[in-house]
Each structure stands twice: as structure tokens, then as C-alpha cells.
């Protein structure tokens, strides 16, 4: 048994690439099939062990498109090898793709002895990948239909889970749900969403924003509905509005190396190193172009996941990247026109609840990337960084799991956060109205007691009874409890009936 395709190229050519999720391995089988975490390959169709181009063509045909490996492997294959293969199959789909990519990566032409004929072929199979309208190369009759361009491109595979989430129509259901609410209730639910999206986006960063910082971030969230295109100037303004330390305010994308660190000291504590400054600034141009186009070309939630995680992986600022990356989910959905009437899906609230899964999604990229950096401790607060990898690991990345996580959080934000808050507001109104009609209680006291009772499973605690004993009669406490328990019981019964 031996490796073939991308796994062989990665190992034999010692390429800077992440381990494959499904390496192709020759096994005693009669046809290609998935066995466990490998792609079992019959020896009859396996390329020769030393045939570089053969492994590239095998991979393109049977394993999809891995640009991170192809960008490093194809430039090392002599032009003559591609020229000979092209003569044998002048209109072959996979040799055309290989020639097209090699020219794109190197700028060096592969000679054609006759013009390529036949229909245009998509570089990415639309049945396997999420794709978008592409740019056509008439020389090789190949259409680049990836999620980005040849210099920066994410891939999203159409897995069963992704398809399931898309069929759920999360954004359509969110719109329908909000439209089903009375106007006043809808406004209150939206205001709650903005407030808690702000609070939990900061909480993920282990920060509690003051009132001024919260107000500024809420203003930014509302501003996203203006659909302003992403530019360096706009992102700098956003960063300045979300960072309070004057020494961390950016004037442009970073010109120095940054990193993320854990609890350990020195180099051992460095958990992620983003791309070097020059590469970061280049890739941000491509990401911003994608962000300004893709939300109107593909599923907005798919675009939002790529933009958000792509931004945080590039880390273009020295501080504020995390909360800006979550803001960009909202910005992408607004740009697509998917959130109307000021609607916001509080994805940060969902992410805070699922913080472990959020960290895992980030670490799927950050951990293997860290292996390509040599970090040396110089002094406290001073580290030296030496990138030993290839820029391809930052240029081309698999965003499938990041997109699925983003969609799951959007679904959670709708089905749990927004629906629960709307139900809570409905219960609150019912209890408040019933008590207010029967007793003459100060409005602020009644509002606080109803709120505290509902969040305490229908009971007013001894502490609260004592706190309000001189302004609220005992029978009012009892009636609040009685009414709250009845309203909560009716709500639970209605939920069970719907299920």
C-alpha cells in the first residue's frame, strides 16, 4: 500500500500543506471507494510512483481541487512534461486544468501545438463544491468558478450537513418569523438582539464593554444595513470604533507581525501566527473583493462564513480582529439584502454558548499553520518569527467546516435566541398587564419584579421580597408568582403541542 495523488505529492515533494482529510492510498480493491478515513485506490489506476504529473492528473480527476498543493507542485513540473501529455490528449479535461493552473501560478506559458477545442469546463465541480459565476480562460477553455480568485480562494464542499442546513432556509425563516411578530414586539426583539450581540461579541474576547463602547458597537451593527463595501479605510474606521486603547488604534492594515498566545510563556505559548504583513495586505485585497461580490452571487451564509473566518485568519490588525470578524457576518448578510428592517441574527450569542465549537473551528486552521513557523523567545514581550512554510497555506484554504459552523450558529440564533426572547417578551407582557390591572404598583418596581420572577422559573425569591417589602404588598408578590407560573405553564404546553 502506498500514497497516491495529493497525499503522495505532499509527502514526496515535501510541500507546505495541511494533512489531507481523505488521503488516497493504493489498496486491494477493484474500484475507488472510501474506507474509513482514506480513499482506497485500485493499483490498476494508480499513477507510477515517480510520475509527478500523473499524480496531479489523478488528484484532479478523483480528489477534487486542492489549490494549496497544486500551487506548490505544478511549478516544479517541467513544461515539457505538460506539453507531452497535452499532445497525447489535446482536449483532455484534467491536463487542460493542470496547464491552466500552472500558467496562472507561474506566468509561464505551456506551448500548444493546436488550439484547445470543446466546451468550457469548470475548474471546480459544481456538484462537489459551492461555486460562483466564474471567469473564463479561452486559451485552455477552463472557467475559474472558485470562491475567490487564483491568488486567494476558499473551498466549500457540498457535504450532507451543508445541504441540510441550506434546505432549512435559515434566512427565509428568520424573515418570516420576525414578520409574524406584532410591530412593537419585533422592535423590542431586534433591540434585544443588538444589545446581546454586542455584549457576547465582547464576552468572547473576555471583555465587558462599558456603555459608551456598547453604544458605538451597536451603531456599527446598525450601520451595516447601509451595505457599504469593504475597503481598508472602512475596516480601519470599524477597528477604531471597537478598540478603546489608543495605542491599539490602527491607521492601516498592520505592518508588523502579530500572533495569538495562550497561558504558556515564550514561544511555547504562541498558538497561531497569521501571515507576514506583506502577504496579509495582499490577501486582504482579495478577501475584500470577494466580500463585496460574493454575498450577491452565492448563499449569503456561505459567503459570510468565508469572509468572517478568512478575516480572522489573516488578522489584519494588531487588536480587534475577533469582534470585527463576527461583525462581518452581519455585514455580509446585509450586503446580500438578506436582513431587512434592521433585523440582526445574534450569532455571537450563539457562539458564546458554543464557545468550545467556535474554538475548534478556529483551531482546525490555526494549529496546522503554527507548525510552519519557527518562533524564538528573545525577551519578555519580544519574539522572533521565521516563516518556514509556503504562502499557499494562507492563500488557499478549506472553509467547509467554518461555513457549516457559521450556518449552525445562525440557525441557533434564530431557533433558540430570537424565538426564546420573543416568547419571554410575550410572557412578560402578559404578567405585567395582569398585575397592573389589579394592583397600583410603581412601574419600575413591577417591571423589575416580573422580569426577576420569570427568570427564576415563576418565583419571587426571599431576597427580592425583602428588597421590595416597603413598596410592594405581600399579596402582590403572591399574585405575580401565580400569574407567572400560569403563563409559563401555558407557554410550555403550546411548545409541546407544536413539537
Task: Tell where the protein language model's regions lie, with residue ranges.
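FIC/Doc superfamily catalytic core
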Residues: 1-318, 323-499
Amino acid at each position: 500500500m502506498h500514497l497516491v495523488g495529493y497525499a503522495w505529492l505532499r509527502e514526496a515533494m515535501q510541500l507546505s500543506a495541511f494533512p489531507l482529510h481523505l488521503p488516497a492510498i493504493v489498496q486491494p480493491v477493484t474500484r475507488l471507494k472510501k474506507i474509513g478515513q482514506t480513499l482506497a485506490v485500485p493499483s490498476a489506476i494508480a499513477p507510477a510512483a515517480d510520475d509527478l504529473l500523473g499524480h496531479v492528473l489523478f488528484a484532479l480527476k478523483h480528489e477534487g481541487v486542492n489549490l494549496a498543493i497544486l500551487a506548490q507542485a505544478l511549478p516544479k513540473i517541467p513544461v515539457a512534461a505538460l506539453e507531452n501529455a497535452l499532445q497525447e490528449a489535446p482536449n483532455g479535461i484534467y491536463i487542460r486544468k493542470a496547464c491552466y493552473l500552472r500558467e496562472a501560478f507561474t506566468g509561464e506559458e505551456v506551448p500548444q501545438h493546436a488550439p484547445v477545442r470543446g466546451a468550457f469546463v469548470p475548474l471546480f465541480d459544481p456538484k462537489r463544491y459551492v461555486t460562483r459565476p466564474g471567469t473564463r480562460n479561452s486559451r485552455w477553455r477552463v472557467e475559474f468558478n472558485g470562491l475567490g480568485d487564483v491568488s486567494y480562494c476558499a473551498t466549500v464542499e457540498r457535504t450532507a450537513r451543508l445541504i441540510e442546513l441550506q434546505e432549512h432556509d435559515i434566512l427565509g425563516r428568520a424573515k418570516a418569523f420576525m414578520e409574524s411578530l406584532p410591530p412593537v414586539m419585533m422592535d423590542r426583539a431586534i433591540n434585544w438582539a443588538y444589545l446581546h450581540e454586542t455584549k457576547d461579541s465582547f464576552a468572547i474576547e473576555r471583555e465587558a464593554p462599558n456603555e459608551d463602547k456598547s453604544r458605538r458597537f451597536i451603531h456599527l451593527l446598525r450601520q451595516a444595513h447601509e451595505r457599504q463595501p469593504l475597503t481598508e479605510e472602512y475596516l480601519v474606521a470599524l477597528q477604531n470604533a471597537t478598540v478603546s486603547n489608543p495605542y491599539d488604534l490602527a491607521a492601516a492594515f498592520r505592518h508588523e507581525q502579530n500572533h495569538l498566545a495562550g497561558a504558556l510563556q515564550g514561544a511555547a505559548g504562541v498558538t497561531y501566527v497569521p501571515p507576514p504583513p506583506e502577504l496579509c495586505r495582499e490577501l486582504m485585497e482579495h478577501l475584500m473583493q470577494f466580500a463585496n461580490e460574493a454575498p450577491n452571487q452565492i448563499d449569503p451564509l456561505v459567503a459570510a462564513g468565508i469572509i468572517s473566518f478568512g478575516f480572522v485568519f489573516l488578522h489584519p490588525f494588531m487588536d480587534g480582529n475577533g469582534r470585527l470578524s463576527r461583525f462581518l457576518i452581519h455585514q455580509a448578510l446585509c450586503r446580500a439584502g438578506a436582513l431587512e428592517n434592521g433585523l440582526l441574527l445574534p450569532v455571537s450569542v450563539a457562539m458564546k454558548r458554543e464557545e468550545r465549537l467556535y474554538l475548534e473551528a478556529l483551531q482546525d486552521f490555526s494549529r496546522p499553520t503554527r507548525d510552519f513557523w519557527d518562533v524564538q523567545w528573545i525577551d519578555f514581550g519580544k519574539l522572533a518569527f521565521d516563516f518556514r512554510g509556503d504562502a499557499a497555506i494562507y492563500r488557499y484554504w478549506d472553509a467547509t467546516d467554518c461555513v457549516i459552523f457559521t450556518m449552525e450558529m445562525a440557525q441557533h440564533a434564530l431557533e433558540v435566541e430570537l424565538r426564546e426572547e420573543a416568547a419571554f417578551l410575550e410572557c412578560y407582557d402578559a404578567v405585567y398587564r395582569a398585575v397592573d390591572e389589579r394592583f397600583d404598583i410603581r412601574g419600575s418596581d413591577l417591571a423589575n419584579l416580573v422580569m426577576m420572577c420569570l427568570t427564576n422559573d415563576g418565583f419571587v425569591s426571599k431576597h427580592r421580597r425583602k428588597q421590595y417589602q416597603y413598596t410592594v404588598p405581600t399579596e402582590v408578590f403572591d399574585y405575580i408568582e401565580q400569574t407567572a407560573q400560569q403563563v409559563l405553564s401555558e407557554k410550555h404546553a403550546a411548545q409541546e403541542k407544536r413539537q
